[in-house]
Curated annotation (Swiss-Prot):
<dbReference type="Pfam" id="PF00355">
    <property type="entry name" value="Rieske"/>
</dbReference>
<feature type="domain" description="Rieske">
    <location>
        <begin position="88"/>
        <end position="203"/>
    </location>
</feature>
<keyword id="KW-0503">Monooxygenase</keyword>
<keyword id="KW-0411">Iron-sulfur</keyword>
<dbReference type="InterPro" id="IPR017941">
    <property type="entry name" value="Rieske_2Fe-2S"/>
</dbReference>
<dbReference type="Pfam" id="PF00848">
    <property type="entry name" value="Ring_hydroxyl_A"/>
</dbReference>
<comment type="similarity">
    <text>Belongs to the bacterial ring-hydroxylating dioxygenase alpha subunit family.</text>
</comment>
<dbReference type="GO" id="GO:0004497">
    <property type="term" value="F:monooxygenase activity"/>
</dbReference>
<feature type="binding site">
    <location>
        <position position="128"/>
    </location>
    <ligand>
        <name>[2Fe-2S] cluster</name>
    </ligand>
</feature>
<dbReference type="InterPro" id="IPR015879">
    <property type="entry name" value="Ring_hydroxy_dOase_asu_C_dom"/>
</dbReference>
<feature type="binding site">
    <location>
        <position position="162"/>
    </location>
    <ligand>
        <name>[2Fe-2S] cluster</name>
    </ligand>
</feature>
<comment type="function">
    <text>Rieske-type iron sulfur protein that can catalyze in vitro the 2-hydroxylation of putrescine, forming 2-hydroxyputrescine. May be involved in the biosynthesis of the cyclic hydroxamate siderophore alcaligin.</text>
</comment>
<keyword id="KW-0408">Iron</keyword>
<dbReference type="InterPro" id="IPR036922">
    <property type="entry name" value="Rieske_2Fe-2S_sf"/>
</dbReference>
<dbReference type="InterPro" id="IPR001663">
    <property type="entry name" value="Rng_hydr_dOase-A"/>
</dbReference>
<keyword id="KW-0560">Oxidoreductase</keyword>
<keyword id="KW-0001">2Fe-2S</keyword>
């Protein structure tokens, strides 16, 4: 993102978009600011500028037509132009922490699996080369669903063994034996290249470590002592872009989320934008003194108990690595949430919950309270997204198209996403 910084008569610089009809703060609306007070910050290409808390409306020139959320042809183009050209999150190394551990990819109905071997973590096909059966995971009546998705090769002598005919592969997918064949066929499992970004594993043509280098230079993004506690698989009956839009706007947090809206405050919202990601940081609402729901009260209480009554330094940090990977930081919590679009109106959300090892081992109530609060907000977000797509569908069916303005700074992240989307799709503004 490129910004310019014109100087007003008082000599104070204000960032302005590189087109005259798009701005964060117009010099003609200027009033003198005390730069020492908290405010809203936006960082772009190394520039950090205070532009105060003065909200304004930005014209909706980059928003998408209502048909974009339902069109099968567009969905197919997205697969080619976005998903095949991006870094796609596969899983974290900590999903398979011990030698011999395996975990099938639920987002692919178990068709591939992460396996930890002497070389590290590898991604291999979970489909036997003999009769193309799924091997690891699953159970009778649910062979490809979210059941029995992890285990250890120690149970099968360190090897991957097909349950149908006992074809046996080593932990790298190399065929060791095929019963009652005169010679072992040269038929190994396919392996897939992974790119490691501080333990997060991606595949695709981009380099996620380079894309997110400024992000992982921040001390908050060191998760060395965190361990996996739980993986939630959540079905979303709306378009993947709608999910990202809701995630990237804070305008609804106060009005729609009674629990989250009393856990965080958007009064000190700060954005950081980069070519392939955005980061939003929000503060703590009144030192957690007024929980907004019964579920969030449990989370407030457990968090304050763990911190001996001391309120945390921040409420949340929400990252979106385009197109669909989200890194969410809460006090003593890491959540990795990733969308896997299945159709224009069907999206799978796989959510991984990580905590410091000490909390997982000794603070079960903390873990359960945080996850319950998170899922309460997730269900509320589902309603927002479902209402948005239902309204868009109603407009589309009557042959109409409507888009509203962006509220700035609350919806700057949504605007940034729309700009990125149009760029990679090769589309111009409406």
């Amino acid at each position: 993102m490129r910004i310019t910084t014109p100087v007003n008569p008082d000599g104070v610089q204000f960032p302005v978009w590189d087109r005259p009809d798009r701005f964060f703060f117009a010099p003609e609306r200027h009033e003198r600011h005390d730069l020492s007070r908290p405010g809203f910050f936006i960082r772009a290409e190394g520039i950090m500028t205070d532009i105060g808390r003065m909200a304004h409306v930005v014209p909706a020139r980059t928003q998408l037509p209502v048909s974009a959320y339902f069109d099968e042809a567009r969905f197919a183009r997205e697969q080619e132009l976005i998903f095949k050209q991006s870094s796609l999150y596969v899983g974290h190394q900590k999903l398979v922490p011990e030698l011999g551990d395996w975990r099938t990819l639920v987002q692919e109905d178990g068709g591939r699996a992460l396996v930890r071997n002497q070389r590290g973590v590898e991604l291999v096909s979970n489909v036997c080369r003999h009769r193309q059966a799924l091997m690891l995971g699953g159970e009778a009546g649910n062979v490809s669903g979210n059941a029995n998705t992890r285990g250890s090769l120690k149970d099968t002598g360190g090897n991957i063994v097909c349950p149908l005919h006992r074809w046996t592969y080593n932990d790298r997918g190399e065929l060791l034996g095929a019963p009652q064949f005169d010679a072992t066929p040269c038929m190994n499992l396919q392996r897939f290249r992974l790119r490691d970004c501080h333990g997060l594993l991606f595949e695709g043509p981009r380099d996620p470590a380079a894309d997110m280098a400024p992000l992982f230079a921040r001390p908050e993004f060191d998760f060395g002592d965190y361990v996996l506690d739980h993986v939630e698989v959540h079905q979303c009956n709306y378009n993947w872009k709608t999910f990202i839009e809701v995630y990237l706007e804070d305008y609804h947090v106060g009005p729609f989320h009674p629990g989250l809206g009393r856990f965080v405050t958007c009064d000190d919202l700060a954005w950081e934008f980069n070519d392939w990601y955005s980061l939003q940081r929000v503060g703590v609402h009144q030192a957690l003194a007024q929980p907004g729901s019964a579920v969030y009260k449990q989370w407030h209480d457990r968090l304050l108990d763990f911190r001996a009554g001391q309120a945390p330094d921040f409420g949340a940090m929400w990252v979106t690595y385009f197109p669909t990977h989200m890194i969410e930081l809460y006090p003593h919590v890491l959540v990795l949430s990733t969308l896997y679009p299945k159709s224009p109106q069907e999206t799978l959300n796989v959510v991984e919950f990580y905590y410091p090892e000490e909390i997982v081992a000794f603070e079960r109530e903390f873990v359960e309270a945080q996850r319950a609060a998170y899922m309460e907000t997730a269900i509320e977000d589902d309603e927002i997204a479902e209402r948005m797509d239902a309204g868009r569908k109603a407009l589309m069916l009557r042959g109409a198209n409507e888009t509203g303005p962006y509220q700035s700074p609350m919806e700057d992240g949504m605007q940034h996403f729309h700009e990125w989307y149009r760029r990679v799709m090769g589309e111009t503004e409406d």
